[in-house]
């Protein structure tokens, strides 16, 4: 929006041309979203408290979590608002990738909002039934996948890239739709499963989102893409603005979500942010790198799958409780220790993911 204004004002003052630089608009995206999140956060928390929109806590979980009961939830709306406003202000709104990521983010956020609303407002402990949650996730995920497939200008944008193996590129054809569906829906649910401790999900999301923003910036520049031997995706660089907005909004939310949390993001935030990460990775053909960098999300998801499968097949549980962050809590780890150690793991995995840019 402001990019259009800057382009118009260039005829009066050439200095406005500086807003053409993606790096500047990415930084402005961070600062705008961060400011919005920090300024709107206290008001949103008070509003949620006044309306008694608080988190309910399971009795069979760690006893330390009982003190969290009543903490305002659905704070993901703060994250999405900050991301949306910042992106609309600083991104090139004629770029199709910007709209794809925004729409996927907000549509998955809508699913989470309905789930949270039914749990918190209607006092329905089930929330949105799982079959309907996965149905709508599938609908939105498939719509995004089909759109990206049918509008891909070249085969490069539907080819599977294997990190560190520069000569291995697998044309997916229609299989691109299937892969994209699983990446978007899978990452959405993985982040949601991780969102069980104060600040546990948001910081890895910020780190992975920031790293994916770097991939988007490099893939959108033909010289960088050719030098690094990564797919050149025209227009993908504009997603650095969305990535910046995600970083700013996430850090602003963490200000209130850090231990002991004043607000939880709820499904409205977790489902949306996970879907955003998956969509960005798909656009720049870095699904495998997302799997590496989002290792904490993968670990949390696998712990649930293993726990359920083991109990159904043998009647025994592998972990004391799943997702795995609760297992460590029940082993006696203080909550802040679990959180920070998972953050450290994410830092390491993100650095490994970024290293694949040169290890080819």
UniProtKB/Swiss-Prot annotation:
Keywords: Cell cycle, Cell division, Cell inner membrane, Cell membrane, Cell shape, Cell wall biogenesis/degradation, Magnesium, Membrane, Metal-binding, Peptidoglycan synthesis, Transferase, Transmembrane, Transmembrane helix. Signal peptide: none annotated. Catalyzes the initial step of the lipid cycle reactions in the biosynthesis of the cell wall peptidoglycan: transfers peptidoglycan precursor phospho-MurNAc-pentapeptide from UDP-MurNAc-pentapeptide onto the lipid carrier undecaprenyl phosphate, yielding undecaprenyl-pyrophosphoryl-MurNAc-pentapeptide, known as lipid I. Its EC number is 2.7.8.13. Its main location: membrane. Belongs to the glycosyltransferase 4 family. MraY subfamily. This is Phospho-N-acetylmuramoyl-pentapeptide-transferase.
